[in-house]
Amino acid sequence: MKQFRIHKDDKVMVIAGKDKGKIGKVLKILRNKDRILVEKVNVAKRHVRPNPYRQQPGGIIEKEMPLHVSNVMVVCDACAKPTKVGYRYTEDGKKVRFCKKCNEIID
């Protein structure tokens, strides 16, 4: 299984595409497609048919569409900048992620 340096509930910034510069929270990671869903970013309108069995009304809904993982960067809470993420081990042997700009632990 692929290892992404981006995890669910991380704050990320879009660095390429039509939503460049927007910041949002990661909702879901689609590892087999190298894509992630980011809250209120890359929103598209979808036409939905009514489904009486699920009590779902029809109409036009706005839905987040997946972004490629290479088009986003993690935003560090300490320095509030988009940054690369590295891994290191703490004294007790636990593997943690850290910000490569300010050296603070992200997890």
From Swiss-Prot:
The gene is rplX. GO terms for molecular function: rRNA binding; structural constituent of ribosome. InterPro entries: KOW, Rib_uL2_dom2, Ribosomal_uL24, Ribosomal_uL24_CS, Ribosomal_uL24_KOW, Translation_prot_SH3-like_sf. Part of the 50S ribosomal subunit. One of its GO terms (cellular component) is ribosome. The keyword Ribonucleoprotein applies. SUPFAM superfamilies: Translation proteins SH3-like domain. Belongs to the universal ribosomal protein uL24 family. Keywords: Ribonucleoprotein, Ribosomal protein, RNA-binding, rRNA-binding. One of two assembly initiator proteins, it binds directly to the 5'-end of the 23S rRNA, where it nucleates assembly of the 50S subunit. HAMAP family: Ribosomal_uL24_B (MF_01326_B). One of its GO terms (biological process) is translation. This is Large ribosomal subunit protein uL24.
